[in-house]
Amino acid sequence: MAEDEYMRRSTFTDQPVTYGAVGATHAADLLYYPPKGYKPLERSIRLGSGDERFETAATALMAWGVQKGSGIQVTDVTEGTGVQYEGVEFGPDGTPMRMRANRPEEDVFADDGTPFVRNGMTAVLKIPFGPFRVSAPIRVVYVIDEPHRRGFAYGTLHGHPESGEELFLVEQHDDGTVWFVLRALSRPSNAFYRIVSPVLAAVQRRYTAKYLRALHPASSA
């Protein structure tokens, strides 16, 4: 690895997220009580039903399937150092309890060699915008791994057009139906993006629609 790339990655992985309400997307009432200054969003779509559908969707999700299925490149994936952030741990009622210690885990990779999502991981998302790709650095701030709920949330790092957090969740309800849930809070990250906020909002709406389609069986048919 070239020295300049090593320095860039080292600095990037040690960066803190650019917002204070880490873990806020875990709260089901985010739409009603968002952090001050942030715009909340929640959308969901039914993916089908049954255990096989849940496992298929959850596995794709944890392999960055929502992002890749929306045309976003997932690049510069690293484990992070844990210096700035170790993750939130939640109690049975969803209340944040303490920071989650980094634990050794077996590395798991998608078919294309991309590491599966893990807590504390950092990446740079390359988002298509016309003939260009906008770089959006992120850090995974928590992972949900339950029998009928699987997903992760990432927070923004310096250089991202937005400041905030986004949750991607696959869950199986008591009736066997499988749903994809997208929950987010965001605001423009700096003065430039505040000026072009109507454009930023339009891009967000476009990718929200793409995210909701990415795991649907019809998209891979």
Each model region followed by its residue ranges:
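Hydrophobic residues positioned within well-ordered beta-strands of beta-sheet architectures
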Residues: 41-43, 123-125, 136, 152, ...
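Compact beta-sheet-dominated globular domain cores
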Residues: 172-176, 181-187
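A conserved amphipathic terminal alpha-helix motif
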Residues: 9, 188-221
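Extended Gly/Ser/Thr-rich low-complexity repeat segments
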Residues: 61, 167, 197-198
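Hydrophobic-ligand binding "helix-grip"
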Residues: 126-174
